[in-house]
């Protein structure tokens, strides 16, 4: 009972190397540990590539997700987007120009791979959020304007949990609506038998 977490964390990892996992080995892990969810949270290390075109990353990460689905059949995949990151432009800290294009690419490959998606950039406040997280007291992020500190990590986790829980509550409501039997309409003199709605 409870939650068991395996954390595959490598400094400087873009997420692409996990596409080389050995399928047989991963399935052996899965048969013993029976994973329910894989969370992919990458991005900060891709922002420094000097490009605003992330079509290449979108395509390659879509292949990574497909590979993970082979490694761990039936396991749900959640993609958490890159958080905000600030860079100095003309002596002023601003959201890095690459954050939104990368975020959009991550959302697209999540949709294409039928994975769940949480937009961390939006959840933490969108444009300029990292500046606020660094400069407010007590600070929630480090002076590199990239990484959360322990307070920010806790808040980020809370934001993701809240988003997932709200989605789950919405799912339960929609399930209830779908389970309700459709009321049959009795025909009477008012209803025209052959029109766009009731055509037989």
Model-derived regions, located:
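Generic structural signal for well-ordered alpha-helices
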Residues: 61-66, 103, 107
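Conserved SGNH/GDSL esterase-like catalytic core that processes O-acyl groups on lipids
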Residues: 1-63, 70, 147-148, 190-199
């Amino acid at each position: 009972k409870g939650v068991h977490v395996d954390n595959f964390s490598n400094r400087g990892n873009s997420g692409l190397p996990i596409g080389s996992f050995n399928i047989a080995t991963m399935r052996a892990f899965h048969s013993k540990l029976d994973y329910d969810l894989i969370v992919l949270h990458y991005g900060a290390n891709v922002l420094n590539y000097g490009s605003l075109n992330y079509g290449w990353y979108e395509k390659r990460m879509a292949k990574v997700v497909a590979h993970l689905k082979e490694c761990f059949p039936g396991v749900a995949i959640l993609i958490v987007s890159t958080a905000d990151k600030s860079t100095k432009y003309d002596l002023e800290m601003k959201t890095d120009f690459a954050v939104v294009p990368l975020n959009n690419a991550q959302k697209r490959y999540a949709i294409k791979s039928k994975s769940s998606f949480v937009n961390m950039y939006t959840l933490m406040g969108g444009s300029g959020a990292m500046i606020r997280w660094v400069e407010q007291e007590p600070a929630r992020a480090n002076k590199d304007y990239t990484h959360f500190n322990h307070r920010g990590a806790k808040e980020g986790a809370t934001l993701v949990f809240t988003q997932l829980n709200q989605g789950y509550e919405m799912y339960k409501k929609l399930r209830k609506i779908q389970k309700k039997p459709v009321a049959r309409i009795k025909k009477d003199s008012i209803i025209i038998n052959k029109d766009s709605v009731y055509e037989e």
